[in-house]
Amino acid sequence: RFVLEGQTARREEFPLFAVRPDLIGLRPWKGDIHLHSSRSDGREAPAYVAAACRQIGLDFMALTDHRNYRASLEAQAAFQGLAIDFRIFPGEEVHPPDNPVHMVNAGGSFSVQDLMADRAAYDAEIARRAEAMPAGLTPDERRMMASCQWVFEQIRRGDGISILCHPYWITGDAHNITEDL
């Protein structure tokens, strides 16, 4: 409890972050790995987004435009050769066909979205995987889960970080992703 002059006593709570002694000398990095530019639904060019991240003191960022890996390479190219303490990772927000679930590919070495260009091969692989999904799921849930699993595996194959985007989005009057998934 504490009292400020002229006010009544009140209780305040706040989180306290503590680390082991061997971590005290390390500096945590600040960054954002889910950003969009004007190459999808953002407002600014990829290089501008990266510069804005640097300006506000971030140490790293990944541009993850919707279905667009090349925009992140454009951001990287704008800063190539500059001696700055700022890291730009490639990325994209992956939108699998017939699946409302979006996933970030941050730092991956290739575009996962582009792997779905052969739609027939993609659909066949997802159908095969869906058959192995838990029986308690609906056919749509099995396909969505198989699709998400495939995307996450491809991201890991490219040494990227995979993140489930917007898991609690509400579309219409229902969550975008069911609780079972």
List each model region and its residues.
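Beta-strand-enriched, solvent-exposed domains that form extended recognition/catalytic surfaces
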Residues: 1-23
